[in-house]
A protein has these predicted regions:
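Conserved catalytic core of the tyrosine transesterase superfamily
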Residues: 1-260
Length: 260
């Protein structure tokens, strides 16, 4: 098929994302723009849009495109990761719809998300983190939940207002592991996660003893409803107070204030 790329990209954007994945128009527009940028890049390196074939999209070429975004367009690491997420999604789709070049698809899907140089939660030291989770009783359902909330906040630098909306579908459970975080203005960013943390998420979901759907919120309250910002703030403050009693020199800054 001479125009295999345009054919499958059109099906991906107009059929697969809205009908099978249930993505909203804002997310689809973001994905579409990612491919507009890719096509413009390919034009710059001598491949016109109407001539692009799937075989042209190699791992090396995708990596060059991502570096171009960061170095030539001055895109942030977060934006770079968002473009890569769109590309990953397309090649996951191709694995089943057009598996002719599946070995190359696998290489592209193994391109990792790039880690930011600094963590936003720099005010929470490793020592404070260890002390904080050390006072949590993980033997009960809600203690285990609180433990996972604090681990996720430290691992991803997610804010409370973003954390309460996290769903299972937001995690990528295959390499490269990541979480999609939706922030203010419905802006999305993709944050890399460690394999160890992904394993903890899977263990946590299994511990719930009820079938969670991909679209369900990961963290819920006693009524099985989504946690509120105030609810998470209460959880954080509770453990900080306990940890402070044992370690008065730690937690000089207000954790909750920084994470809202």
């Amino acid at each position: 098929m001479n125009n295999d790329f345009s054919y499958y990209l059109r099906k991906f954007l107009s059929e697969y994302l809205p009908r099978e994945k249930g993505f909203n128009s804002n997310t689809i527009d973001s994905y579409r723009y990612s491919f507009i940028l890719l096509l413009n890049y390919l034009k710059d390196v001598g491949i016109k849009a109407e001539k692009v074939k799937i075989i042209d999209l190699t791992k090396d070429r995708i990596v060059d495109f991502l570096n171009y975004l960061e170095n030539n367009r001055n895109n942030s690491i977060s934006t770079r990761n968002s473009r890569l997420a769109a590309i990953h999604s397309f090649f996951k789709y191709l694995q089943y719809e057009y598996p002719d070049y599946i070995d190359e698809y696998t290489k592209i899907l193994n391109i990792p998300f790039k880690k930011a140089k600094t963590k936003q939660m720099s005010y929470l030291t490793v020592e404070e983190m260890i002390k904080l989770i050390g006072v949590i009783d993980k033997s009960n359902k809600y203690g285990y939940r609180d433990y996972m909330i604090i681990l996720l906040m430290y691992e991803s630098a997610i804010r409370v207002s973003e954390l309460i909306n996290v769903r299972l579908i937001d995690f990528r459970f295959s390499k490269p592991y990541s979480i999609k975080i939706v922030g203010k203005g419905n802006k999305q960013r993709y944050v890399p996660l460690s394999e160890q943390f992904i394993e903890k998420v899977q263990e946590y979901v299994l511990s719930l003893n009820n079938k969670k759907l991909e679209t369900d919120f990961l963290f819920t309250n006693h009524s099985n409803n989504k946690l509120t910002r105030a609810g998470v703030s209460h959880i954080l403050n509770k453990y900080v107070i306990i940890a402070k009693k044992n370690n008065p020199s730690l937690f000089k800054e207000n954790v909750t204030t920084h994470t809202l």
